[in-house]
Amino acid sequence: MGVSPERLAEALRAALRENEKFRKRQQKLSEPVAVVGMSCRFPGGVGSPEQLWDFLVQGRDAVSGPPADRCWDPAALPVSGGGFLHDAAEFDPAFFGMSEAEALASDPQQRLLLELSWEGFEHAGINPESLRGSRTGVYAGVIFHDYAYRLPEPPEDVPGYRYFGSAGSVAVGRLA
């Protein structure tokens, strides 16, 4: 007892209708993504996408000695070089509405996220101020939360900021 050709044809038509419904539903859920602006910081003094391209084309090496402005003794390190962001401490806290004390207690990852997000919008020709109050999502991944533990004992006006400044969960809030 087989299936009649008519029933098979109707089952195939029903499956095609379901596939079409699914395709339309998926199409509504999928929005195109366009990268319209970029920014970056890499070891070797790379501070923009254009500089990164030049760096790669020239085949340069980003390995250098450790920066002296970090919370470590370069002579005591077990390595003589690495890929370091030498300008990580350069930050304009007033531009981002932060006090000097808050900036000092903030993980460099948070400061870089603020700077690079702003630069990415500028690179795209978008005024970051125009996004205030808009339906814009902020997503960021932050790893290695060891900055607070590496800080020497902070000045008296910094402790209140120390924990928020080193929490990865606060990074997107600063940006938003």
Residue ranges and their predicted role:
Residues 25-176:
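Cys-dependent condensing catalytic cores that perform Claisen condensation/acyl-transfer
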